[in-house]
C-alpha cells in the first residue's frame, strides 16, 4: 500500500538521502525499515522498547556509544514520551558531519502505537533540532498537505491509500506531514 500521507515526503526524502551517497553511510533506523534497500554501506534497525532513544544513546556490547553517518526516524517521534531528550541522544550518536532525518505527522488521527504524544510543523521540527544542538544553518525542514488529504484521513480504513488522481498540491497552511534533515557540525 502506498500511503497518501507519505507519498510526497518519501519522494523528497529519498532524493535527499540519495544525494548523500548512501553507499558510504553507516545507518541506524529507529523503529522502522523504510531505509532497507537504499544501498547503505550498513543499515541497522533499532526497535522500541529494547532500544529507547529517550533513555540514552544506543550502545554496543562493550557499553560504548554507537556512531552513525545517518540516523533515520520515520513516523516514530510522535510516539515517544520525551522527543527532546531522544533528539539530543540522536545528536550524540552521530559522527561529525552525520545527518538525522526525521519525518512526523501533523494533521492525522490519533494513533497510539503504543502511545501518541506529539505533533510538529516544519518550524516545530526546526526548533526541536536546534534545541538538541543542531545548527539552524544545517537544518532543512519541509511540510506538505492540503484539505483533500486531510479529508481522506477521516476515512476508514486508515491511513488512506494513494489513488491515482489524488490532489498532491501543497497548501502551506494545511500541513499533514513534516520532515527534516539536520547535519551535526
Regions found by a protein language model. Name each.
Residues 69-81:
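A short SAM/SAH-binding and catalytic strip from SAM-dependent methyltransferases
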Residues 3, 81-89, 95, 99-185:
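S-adenosyl-L-methionine-dependent methyltransferase catalytic module, highlighting the catalytic core
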Residues 1-72, 175-179:
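Conserved N-terminal segment of class I S-adenosyl-L-methionine
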Residues 17-21, 87-92:
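Short amphipathic alpha-helices and their capping/turn segments at secondary-structure boundaries
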